[in-house]
């Protein structure tokens, strides 16, 4: 499932196959170009930059910053307004994720749960149309899981598409509109929560019955929207 995300977002090169995002073929496209198109992701193992502050991590998430270009770097007047807008967006997102009081702390000092929140907030700096979340709830305590679920639901209400990988069927069934279940490297079911919950192959995969599909050992999981 992570390999699937890596291919979609340009972190791995495909051997074969084609796919499109918003009408544009993106297979093999560089990851930063895919992000600029509006498809962003988080990682199963968070990628926060520990020696930078939470705020600086957020600022790095904004695309197409004029001040990063050599031709503009010495002309601050050309990008000062954009810089202020980017910082304002970062402040708003940190407040939304209840992290504004941590803005100047080093990312390395954050707990695992706080890093998950930071990674999701940083991804939203790109104002994406589609966000891919790789096991966002894994290892989280109940309070963190509920917080993350609330953010996912808010994104959906705002018109942002969310595709996430998750193993917890209760979480998947409770929040998803459409589910794709993978086992042993292949799709075994696809449909609405009501449809998937009645699928015998899904029941076998998660309960470890005798259809030849092992119980969930990390090779079984679901991509949900």
Q: Where do the language-model regions lie?
A:
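Conserved ABC transporter NBD signature motif
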Residues: 17-24, 36-37
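Helix-to-loop junction immediately C-terminal to a conserved catalytic motif
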Residues: 9
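Conserved ABC ATPase signature
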Residues: 106-110
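Conserved catalytic motifs of ABC-family nucleotide-binding domains
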Residues: 127
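A short, surface-exposed alpha-helical micro-motif characterized by mixed small hydrophobic
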Residues: 172-174
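Conserved ABC ATPase "signature" region
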Residues: 70-102, 132, 150-153
């Amino acid at each position: 499932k992570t390999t699937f995300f890596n291919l979609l977002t340009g972190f791995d090169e495909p051997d074969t196959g084609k796919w499109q995002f918003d009408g544009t073929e993106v297979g093999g496209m560089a990851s930063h170009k895919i992000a600029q198109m509006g498809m962003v992701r988080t990682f199963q193992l968070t990628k926060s930059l520990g020696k930078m502050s939470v705020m600086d991590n957020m600022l790095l998430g904004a695309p197409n910053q004029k001040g990063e270009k050599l031709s503009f770097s010495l002309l601050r007047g050309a990008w000062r307004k954009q810089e202020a807008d980017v910082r304002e967006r970062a402040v708003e997102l940190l407040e939304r994720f209840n992290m504004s009081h941590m803005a100047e702390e080093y990312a390395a000092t954050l707990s695992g749960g706080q890093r998950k929140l930071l990674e999701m907030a940083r991804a939203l700096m790109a104002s994406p149309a589609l966000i891919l979340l790789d096991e966002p709830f894994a290892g989280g305590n109940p309070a963190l899981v509920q917080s993350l679920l609330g953010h996912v639901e808010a994104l959906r209400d705002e018109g942002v598409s969310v595709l996430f990988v998750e193993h917890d069927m209760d979480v998947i069934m409770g929040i998803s509109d459409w589910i794709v279940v993978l086992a042993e490297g292949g799709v075994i079911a696809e449909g609405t929560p009501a449809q998937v919950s009645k699928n015998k192959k899904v029941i076998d995969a998660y309960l470890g019955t005798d259809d030849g599909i092992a119980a969930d050992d990390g090779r079984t999981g679901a991509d949900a929207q």
